[in-house]
């Protein structure tokens, strides 16, 4: 129904953001990867959207890129993968890394997404492997490996901060501002310094 939404970015919650357009606040569910790339609150943004209607729920899902929206829709074609699971998968890394993991049959990367078990990961790989085109094949393998390693470090650092009592939202925000070239231990130390100010 809606192709996209433009408006002022008002607030962020665990799995959705609020965009104001014509004095109406729209609740837009989105992925962690889109959230990590959003500008400061108060700025104008545009998200490509998909509306999902069920008997007990109506929701709008939005993403910064058409590529992420397309991947979201593709994931929904898999039996057992709903909107929540699709967002979870898109939150473990960027779209390119997820596509690469599916294409390479990398169950380990896919099962890092909360709520995605081994059987679901296998089903995703089986059904989508031949449907996915990966633009990142234009990049060299070293760059791809570095992307996966960076995403893994970010996830582990966020998990460590959550264990220490910080919220996932707070942890993500701080970790994403840290230098990803550092070791996992250095990233956590840098984040803690910032949080303890």
Swiss-Prot record:
GO terms for molecular function: ATP binding; four-way junction DNA binding; four-way junction helicase activity. Residues 149-197 are annotated as: Domain III. Residues 1-64 are annotated as: Domain I. CDD domains: UBA_RuvA_C. One of its GO terms (cellular component) is cytoplasm. Residues 65-144 are annotated as: Domain II. Keywords: Cytoplasm, DNA damage, DNA recombination, DNA repair, DNA-binding. One of its GO terms (biological process) is DNA repair. InterPro entries: DNA_helicase_Holl-junc_RuvA_I (IPR013849), Hlx-hairpin-Hlx_DNA-bd_motif (IPR003583), NA-bd_OB-fold (IPR012340), RuvA (IPR000085), RuvA_2-like (IPR010994), RuvA_C (IPR011114), RuvA_C_sf (IPR036267). It is found in: Cytoplasm. It comes from the Bacteria. Residues 145-149 are annotated as: Flexible linker. Homotetramer. Forms an RuvA(8)-RuvB(12)-Holliday junction (HJ) complex. HJ DNA is sandwiched between 2 RuvA tetramers; dsDNA enters through RuvA and exits via RuvB. An RuvB hexamer assembles on each DNA strand where it exits the tetramer. Each RuvB hexamer is contacted by two RuvA subunits (via domain III) on 2 adjacent RuvB subunits; this complex drives branch migration. In the full resolvosome a probable DNA-RuvA(4)-RuvB(12)-RuvC(2) complex forms which resolves the HJ. The RuvA-RuvB-RuvC complex processes Holliday junction (HJ) DNA during genetic recombination and DNA repair, while the RuvA-RuvB complex plays an important role in the rescue of blocked DNA replication forks via replication fork reversal (RFR). RuvA specifically binds to HJ cruciform DNA, conferring on it an open structure. The RuvB hexamer acts as an ATP-dependent pump, pulling dsDNA into and through the RuvAB complex. HJ branch migration allows RuvC to scan DNA until it finds its consensus sequence, where it cleaves and resolves the cruciform DNA. Has three domains with a flexible linker between the domains II and III and assumes an 'L' shape. Domain III is highly mobile and contacts RuvB. Belongs to the RuvA family. NCBIfam families: ruvA. This is Holliday junction branch migration complex subunit RuvA. It comes from Clostridium botulinum (strain Hall / ATCC 3502 / NCTC 13319 / Type A).
């Amino acid at each position: 129904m809606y192709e996209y939404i433009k408006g002022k970015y008002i607030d962020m919650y665990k799995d959705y953001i609020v965009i104001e357009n014509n004095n109406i606040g729209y609740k837009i569910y989105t992925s962690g990867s889109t959230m990590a790339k959003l500008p400061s609150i108060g700025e104008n943004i545009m998200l490509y959207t998909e509306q999902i209607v069920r008997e007990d729920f109506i929701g709008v899902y939005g993403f910064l890129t058409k590529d992420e929206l397309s991947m979201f829709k593709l994931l929904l074609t898999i039996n057992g993968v709903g909107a929540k699971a699709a967002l979870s998968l898109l939150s473990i890394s960027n779209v390119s890394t997820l596509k690469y993991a599916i294409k390479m049959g990398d169950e380990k990367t896919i099962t890092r997404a909360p709520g995605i078990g081994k059987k679901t990961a296998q089903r995703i790989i089986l059904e989508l492997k031949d449907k996915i085109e990966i633009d990142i094949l234009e990049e060299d393998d070293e760059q791809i490996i570095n992307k996966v390693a960076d995403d893994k470090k970010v996830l582990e650092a966020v998990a460590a901060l959550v264990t220490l009592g910080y919220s996932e939202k707070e942890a993500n925000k701080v970790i994403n501002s840290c230098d990803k070239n550092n070791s996992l231990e250095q990233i956590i130390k840098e984040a803690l310094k910032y949080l303890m100010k």
